[in-house]
Design a protein with these regions (language model features):
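An N-terminal, well-structured beta->alpha segment
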Residues: 1-69, 145-175
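N-terminal small/polar loop signature for handling phosphorylated ligands or for N-terminal nucleophile
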Residues: 34, 44-110, 191-250
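Phosphate-binding and adjacent anionic-ligand microenvironments
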Residues: 236, 276-413
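Short beta-strand-to-turn element immediately C-terminal to the catalytic PLP-Schiff-base lysine
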Residues: 115-118, 248-252, 332-333
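Gly/Ser/Thr-rich active-site loops/lids in small-molecule metabolic enzymes
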Residues: 124, 201-203, 255-274, 341-350
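Proline/glycine-rich low-complexity loops and linkers
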Residues: 77, 130-157, 252-324, 331-332
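Gly/Ser/Thr-enriched, mixed-charge loops and adjacent short helices
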Residues: 1-2, 19, 111-232
Length: 413
């Protein structure tokens, strides 16, 4: 019996010892290939993979299936960050999209298929529903010829050109970089070294598929980075998740900086140092800190449901400056309508260079101006049917008080 495949907020995820099998990957990529050949016949599709075991093998399978549908499938020649693959598709006029095989920020044993459209955005709900509805029950055994390419050099030049290289070089900074064994290893560290930054890279030359670390840039998984920053006397620790579309950070005192604070700093850099304007798009779960700062900087805030695909859809309308989710994904519209953890790290370095202040001082200044905020998150793992039941029940849950205080509002977005 074939598995029922449902896409989540950012692609299809399953355990390698469960539903993430050769047959199911072939089924998903067959549906993608048929869709794109119908809407974009003969166009280019980039296929990438990260450092997880078997990611490369599944990417080779996917590229062959995509090519069998008459599309120009391009398989990357080495592990790449998802933002690099997305950028390659977005800036290739002949490309209709990209497909990434990655463990992303998920624990050991998981792999995902992330789908990106030709403009770099996450696939919208209409595309997802068509894929799910037209997916074959069994793989068709299709395999075509694909080509390979190294997309990294062009991507590295592009993100480096986005920041003020002279300011960063003049600052003579020291940072710790933690790619968490993921796809950014070597790339972010090398970029910063080329910009004159002294870098201590940890969790490099490793895989994210290990039991002692989850490649999610939050506590407790950033503990090693926190220690390294203090021991090295660095001005910051820069952390990316398994496929480098999310960012985490540590200040010079070894304190974890939550994603809302990072987005606030990035927003400040874009407005105050680049004189850029536009709407700021955030998920419902994003902190009020970002909203306060955006309004103070004269930017209108747009709130969307959880899932970056909703933010990307708003970015594609135009007039958006930046979009961010509470999990550390930050997308800058002038770059592409998708998250890029590597670019976000470079912008933090640029901000520290221009202000002459380490990360902790910048956060202290934020809190002095806009108040101190706290944020906590607890994930709950549910089976698909249980999650659907919860979605049905939640609209009827409207608490009159929480910890003795009345909620200002309740949203079921």
């Amino acid at each position: 019996m074939c598995a029922i495949i449902h896409f989540g907020t950012d692609g299809w995820r399953a355990r390698v010892d469960g539903d993430f099998t050769i047959n199911n990957v072939a089924r998903v990529t067959d549906a993608i290939g048929r869709l794109w050949q119908k809407t974009n016949p003969g166009k280019t599709v980039y296929v990438g993979f990260d450092t997880r075991p078997q990611a490369c093998e599944f990417a080779e399978l996917a590229a062959g299936v995509i090519a069998a549908h008459g599309l120009d499938a391009v398989l990357v020649s080495r592990p790449v960050p998802t933002p690099a693959l997305t950028w390659a598709a977005a800036y290739d006029g002949e490309a209709c999209g990209a497909l990434m095989v990655t463990g992303s920020h998920h624990p050991q044993g998981y792999l995902c298929l992330k789908l990106r459209m030709g403009d770099g955005s996450t696939a919208n709900q209409d595309v997802i529903e068509e894929l799910e509805e037209t997916m074959a029950a069994e793989p068709l055994g299709l395999e075509g010829q694909y080509r390979t390419a190294d997309i990294i050099p062009d991507y590295m030049r592009a993100v480096a050109s986005f920041v003020d290289a002279d300011a960063i070089r003049a600052a003579h900074m020291r940072v710790v970089v933690d790619p968490m064994g993921g796809a950014a290893q070597g790339y972010l560290a090398d970029l910063l070294r080329e910009l004159g930054v002294e870098v201590h890279e940890i969790h490099a030359d490793e895989t994210t598929d290990r039991g002692d670390i989850c490649p999610d840039p939050v506590e407790p998984w950033v503990d090693a980075c926190e220690r390294a920053v203090v021991e090295d006397g660095a001005c910051a620790g820069l952390v990316t998740d398994g496929d480098a579309d999310r960012i985490g950070a540590v200040d010079e005192r070894g304190r974890y900086i939550h994603p809302h604070q990072i987005m606030a700093l990035v927003l400040g850099d874009l407005v105050q140092y680049r004189n850029l304007k536009g709407r700021v798009v955030v998920n419902l779960s994003c902190s009020t800190l970002v909203r306060r700062i955006a309004e103070a900087l004269g930017c209108r805030v747009v709130i969307k449901p959880v899932g970056f695909k909703y933010i990307a859809a708003e970015m594609k309308k135009g007039g958006v400056l930046v979009g961010g989710e509470e999990a550390g994904g930050i997308g800058i519209a002038a770059h592409m309508p998708e998250r890029d953890g590597i670019l976000a790290c470079l912008i933090l370095c640029e901000l520290m260079a221009k202000t002459g202040a380490p990360l902790g001082v910048l956060i202290d200044q934020l809190e002095a101006s806009f108040g101190k905020t706290s944020y906590g998150r607890r994930d709950l793992r549910l089976e698909a049917e249980d999650a659907e039941t919860l979605r049905t029940l939640l609209p009827g849950v409207n608490p009159k008080s929480i910890c003795g205080k009345a909620p200002q509002s309740v949203s079921h977005m």
